[in-house]
């Protein structure tokens, strides 16, 4: 009898301790108890895309180009929500098997680039040949869907974009010798539980979030639009843990991965 009472008391004490741990976890971590909330404080509303570009992108033509590229990221977001991932039976120029979502994302980017009044040349990782477009100002190169091989497992994937002034380098397309330092803008879109796009502007790096609610994202004036600025002046800490699930093979022989 005494043993049973002691066992019951131990179980009760353990439950109380677990409850305290869960309470602390909820106070310090995200709702799942497994990940920190972002350091961004909750606000009733956030700056609009237009507001940030007006303040932090002095070139009106570049501003228009950025907005067009973000429209492309929004279209890819919607396509990924409904597209079935299938093998197309074709390879890209690097010998990678193309998936349906690769082709869909690349077609969205090409449609945008070829119709843009600001883009003079375009090239895709799927077929890295510079194509003359109808615009007049920039050369845009992109990977339409980085990590597409894991999208069917519901991992996050992304679009990577670089923007250069046309004729930055030499050669017929003006890109021979051009480097990343010559870019006037770069963008990384992440399509996960939500879509965010990291964009470099005149004075730093900004994060824009897409479609925060079915109505859109709320602005300071109470209205809604597709994009809001969710973080400003983003920096990568010198000591960070960054892991790429699509690069698991590197964990076998890369010391940095093992150290995680």
What are these regions (language model features)?
Residues 1-32:
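N-terminal mitochondrial targeting presequence
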Residues 26-87, 92, 97, 103-260:
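IMPase-like, lithium-sensitive Mg2+-dependent phosphomonoesterase catalytic core
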């Amino acid at each position: 009898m005494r043993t049973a009472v002691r066992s019951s008391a131990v179980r009760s004490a353990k439950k109380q301790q677990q409850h305290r741990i869960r309470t602390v976890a909820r106070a310090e971590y995200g709702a799942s108890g497994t990940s920190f909330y972002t350091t961004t404080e909750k606000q009733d509303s956030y700056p609009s895309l237009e507001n940030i570009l007006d303040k932090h992108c002095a070139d009106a033509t570049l501003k228009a180009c950025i907005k067009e590229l973000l429209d492309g990221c929004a279209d890819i977001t919607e396509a990924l929500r409904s597209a079935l991932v299938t093998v197309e039976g074709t390879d890209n120029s690097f010998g990678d098997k193309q998936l349906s979502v690769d082709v869909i994302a690349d077609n969205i980017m090409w449609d945008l680039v070829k119709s843009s009044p600001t883009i003079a040349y375009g090239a895709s990782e799927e077929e890295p040949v510079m194509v003359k477009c109808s615009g007049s100002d920039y050369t845009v190169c992109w990977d339409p869907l980085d990590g597409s091989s894991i999208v069917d497992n519901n991992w996050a994937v992304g679009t990577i974009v670089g923007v250069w002034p046309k004729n930055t380098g030499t050669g017929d397309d003006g890109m021979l010798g051009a480097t990343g330092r010559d870019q006037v803008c770069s963008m990384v879109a992440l399509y996960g539980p939500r879509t965010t796009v990291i964009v470099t502007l005149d004075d730093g790096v900004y994060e824009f979030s897409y479609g925060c609610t079915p109505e859109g994202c709320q602005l300071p004036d109470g209205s809604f639009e597709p994009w809001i600025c969710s973080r400003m002046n983003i920096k990568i800490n010198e000591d960070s843990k960054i892991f790429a699930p699509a690069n698991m093979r590197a964990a076998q022989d890369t010391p940095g991965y093992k150290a995680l």
